Amino acid sequence: MEYKALNINDLPKEFSQKVLEEAPDNPNFPKVSVILTTYNREYFFTESIESLLEQDYPNLEIIVSDDGSSDNTFNIACEYAQENPHIKVVRNTHARGSAGNRNNGLDHASGELIMLLDDDDLLFKEAISQMMNVYLDFDKHYGIIIANCTRSDDGFLSGQGISESREISFQEVLCGCLDGEFLTLFERQLLGQRRFNENLRRGNMGLLWLKLHKNRACYYLHKPLKFYRIHAESLTQNLKYQPLEMVKNYEQDILLFYRDRLKYCPAHLARLCATAALLYRQGGDRKRAFKKILQSLAIHPNLLAIQVFFCLFLPVSCLPKLKIRQRIEK
C-alpha cells in the first residue's frame, strides 16, 4: 500500500519546536554534518544547497564533495562557500563514483551526526531540526533516525513498509520489510573505520546501514522531510543494464548477513539467492546461476528459484530484467 505524502507546511511542528526554542544560536548543540555529493549537476545543485541553507537547525556543517565535475558545479559550490563559512568544498580523492565520493565527504565531516544528500534532492526547511529533536527527546537512545521522502513524479512517499512513527528493529530492515528511499541521520561514531565499498558500483548504501543498525537502535519518523527527485538521469532504465555488476551487491549482502537472515527470515534469504541466480543468468554465467538456484532451494523452497531454473534454458534476450529502481552510481 502506498501512502500519499502530506504537504510539509501542514505537518505539526512539535518535533522541531524544542530545537528552535532551546538552542537558536548555541554552538554546543550537536553539530550535524550534511555531506552533499555532486557531479556535473549545476542545474540541480543550486536548488539542493539552497535547501540546506534554509534549514532552521542552528549548528550545521555542509560538506560539498565534488567528483571531478567538468561543468560549472565546482565553481558554483566554491562561490557558496565564500559567502557561507559553514560550507566546505572538497574534491574527491577516493575512487571515482558515488561510493568514493561519499567516503571522501565522510573524511572531512566533523559533526556528531551525519546526513548524506545527493545533489538532485531537496530538504524541507525543518528536516534536520525535526530529526534532531527525535534524537534529543529520546536522550540520544536512537543513534539512527530515518524519515520519509516525497517523490517528485507522483507525490507519494518513496519509503514503503511502515505507516507510523516508531522504533524499527534490526530484523525488519534485515528481512526486507522496508523498501524504497528514506532520509537518514546517524551518529558519526557508529562508523568507526567503516566506509562504503568502493568496489561496488551500485546500491551499496544498504549494506552499510545494516552494519550500523545491527548495533544501534533506529527510529522512524513518519513524515516526508526530503523531496526525492525522479528524473531522466536518476533511473537505471537509462543505463546499460549490467547484471554482473548488480549481482556483486547481492553477493555481498548475502555473505555479510547470511547467518542473521537464516535465523530470522530464511524465505527472504532464499529469494535474495534466487535473484542473484537470475542476474548471473542474465550476465551469461549459467554455472554460477545454477549454484545460486541450488543454494536458494536448500535454504527455503520458493517459486522464484524454480522460475530462474527454467530460465537457464532460455536465450538471454528472452529473460526479464529486474525492475529495480535505483539512483545512478557512476
What are the residue ranges of the model-derived segments?
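Conserved donor NDP-sugar-binding/catalytic core segment of glycosyltransferases
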Residues: 126-158
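Short, well-formed alpha-helical segments that are part of the catalytic scaffolds
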Residues: 18-19, 40-54
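Cell-envelope/extracellular polymer assembly enzymes that use nucleotide-activated donors
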Residues: 30-33, 61, 207
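Catalytic core of nucleotide-sugar-dependent glycosyltransferases
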Residues: 225-231, 237-263, 286-299
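Conserved nucleotide-sugar donor-binding catalytic segment
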Residues: 158-239
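Glycine-rich, basic loop-to-helix element that forms the pyrophosphate-binding segment
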Residues: 92-109
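A conserved acidic beta->alpha catalytic loop
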Residues: 51, 66-75, 94, 118
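Short aromatic/hydrophobic "clamp" motif used to bind/position activated sugar donors
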Residues: 114
